[in-house]
């Protein structure tokens, strides 16, 4: 793809890991991205507080390069409380109380694989091993859940899934809840494994369908079957 000087300049301003930037170039130069940039700029001009901090918006992609992805855990949008969101779905910064969904995830992990329940909720260790912790929407206004939906992020993360579909195989996609499952309809199930369950939020999980889903053991079993190093799900203290 031959780029003009203007296009190269636009790409240079995107703080994105190189393998993802190359693969997502058509989207990064699309009207969707222009519109999204304008929206975020207007939010900042209006002095709105946006989470996660700008340097962490693309954390999921920057920590887990395209050719390192083994697993995708799809979330909806970032936590909207102070010091929570760190750019990884379901993850929070160290020192922050565990959100209820993450507490349920840790309980399921403990029941499934006997992994001790972590006192902190920073999932960076998973991301570094190839777990792409991808929210559908990558930003949110402080205290306003879902406030940045339908501004272009959904199309961006659809493009991420499409790149994985086309360029990779034997990835495990973990889709918790109806929202993630709808978004995951575009995944090629002949090339990848798709695991579904209810959402880990207390409201959904307590109705049944999340606890006992055993996605962590099923993920590692599939990876081993395809000669791929399994994930060490235990977080450091």
Swiss-Prot record:
GO biological process: base-excision repair, AP site formation via deaminated base removal
Reaction(s) this enzyme catalyzes, per UniProt: Hydrolyzes single-stranded DNA or mismatched double-stranded DNA and polynucleotides, releasing free uracil
InterPro entries reported in the protein's UniProt record: UDG_fam1, Ura-DNA_Glyclase_AS, Uracil-DNA_glycosylase-like, Uracil-DNA_glycosylase-like_sf
Highest taxon above the source species: Bacteria
Enzyme class: hydrolase
Cellular compartments per GO CC: cytoplasm
Compartmental location: Cytoplasm
Keyword Repressor attached: no
GO molecular function, one term: uracil DNA N-glycosylase activity
Keywords: Cytoplasm, DNA damage, DNA repair, Hydrolase
EC number: 3.2.2.27
Active site location: 77
Main location: cytoplasm
A Pfam family reported for this protein in Swiss-Prot or TrEMBL: UDG
PROSITE patterns attached to this UniProt entry: U_DNA_GLYCOSYLASE (PS00130)
Function of the protein: Excises uracil residues from the DNA which can arise as a result of misincorporation of dUMP residues by DNA polymerase or due to deamination of cytosine.
Family: Belongs to the uracil-DNA glycosylase (UDG) superfamily. UNG family.
Matches recorded under PANTHER family: URACIL-DNA GLYCOSYLASE
Protein name: Uracil-DNA glycosylase
Organism encoding this protein: Acinetobacter baumannii (strain AYE)
